[in-house]
Amino acid sequence: MKFIGIIPARYASTRFPAKPLAVLGGKPVIQRVYEQVSGILDEAYVATDDERIESAVKAFGGKVVMTSVHHKSGTDRCYEAYTKVGRGYDVVVNIQGDEPFIQKSQLEAVKACFEDPATQIATLVKPFIPDDGLEALENVNSPKVVVGKNMNALYFSRSIIPFQRNVEKEGWLKGHTYYKHIGLYAYRADVLKEITSLPQSSLELAESLEQLRWLENGYTIKVGISEVETIGIDTPQDLARAEAFLKQREGE
């Protein structure tokens, strides 16, 4: 089975313009993501709508493909890039361009989901632990996932799910395993083509989570579990935290 990685990278981020080109430990963020992915998948490309990002990727020797400026999601950008670089792959892996610390184990966990021939789409979750605290569980920027016994996602929400009746909220993390969604997706190539043609759904619009469009239309999402905590970069403050984390790791 052949896997291709696509790393969507936009220049015009509302909260952090030019984020892919921000320097982290002497390298652009997008370069760090690309280097983490290279060698684990059969091939990897950055998909961008901006010539400055294209130039930066070429400068460090990466592969890049230009895509439309009109895409509403990274999934749409992934599909356009896939159609441009060739279709000889079984699975397309969508790697967030703001995850410079994505780990090999996480990519391998997503790949393993496709050992089940019934898997259409796969993603990752990380268990919340009691030490994370209630504030982390309540964070609407960390979507929660309810997972079935077959390891398929039942629902994603920015709210805390499930609600534990007759249990004080402060004790929820001790009495149940909650899962935080990690924004790494993989799709069988034919499924990717299908889901990019779907109109936005009511649940997707309500929660602002595109994966609900797929669930609402009957697609299944297989879930892999990761114990690794990643540091996504959405704001300049996140970049500062990532810089501190990198220095600490390199000093160990």
Swiss-Prot record:
Show the catalytic activity. Answer: 3-deoxy-alpha-D-manno-oct-2-ulosonate + CTP = CMP-3-deoxy-beta-D-manno-octulosonate + diphosphate
Nucleotidyltransferase as a keyword of this entry, yes or no, is yes
A Pfam family found in this protein is CTP_transf_3
Biological processes, Gene Ontology terms: CMP-keto-3-deoxy-D-manno-octulosonic acid biosynthetic process; lipopolysaccharide biosynthetic process
Q: What compartments host this protein?
A: Cytoplasm
Q: What is its main location?
A: cytoplasm
- What pathway, per the record? Nucleotide-sugar biosynthesis; CMP-3-deoxy-D-manno-octulosonate biosynthesis; CMP-3-deoxy-D-manno-octulosonate from 3-deoxy-D-manno-octulosonate and CTP: step 1/1; Bacterial outer membrane biogenesis; lipopolysaccharide biosynthesis
- Gene3D superfamilies given in the database record: Spore Coat Polysaccharide Biosynthesis Protein SpsA, Chain A (3.90.550.10)
Q: What is its EC number?
A: 2.7.7.38
Q: Which UniProt keywords apply?
A: Cytoplasm, Lipopolysaccharide biosynthesis, Nucleotidyltransferase, Transferase
User: Where is coiled-coil annotated?
Assistant: none
What GO terms are given for molecular function?
3-deoxy-manno-octulosonate cytidylyltransferase activity
Show the InterPro entries listed in the entry.
Cytidylyl_trans, KdsB, Nucleotide-diphossugar_trans
Q: Which PANTHER family match?
A: 3-DEOXY-MANNO-OCTULOSONATE CYTIDYLYLTRANSFERASE, 3-DEOXY-MANNO-OCTULOSONATE CYTIDYLYLTRANSFERASE, MITOCHONDRIAL
Name the protein family.
Belongs to the KdsB family.
Name of the protein in its database record = 3-deoxy-manno-octulosonate cytidylyltransferase
In its UniProt entry, the species of origin is given as Phocaeicola vulgatus (strain ATCC 8482 / DSM 1447 / JCM 5826 / CCUG 4940 / NBRC 14291 / NCTC 11154)
Q: Which gene carries the instructions for this protein?
A: kdsB
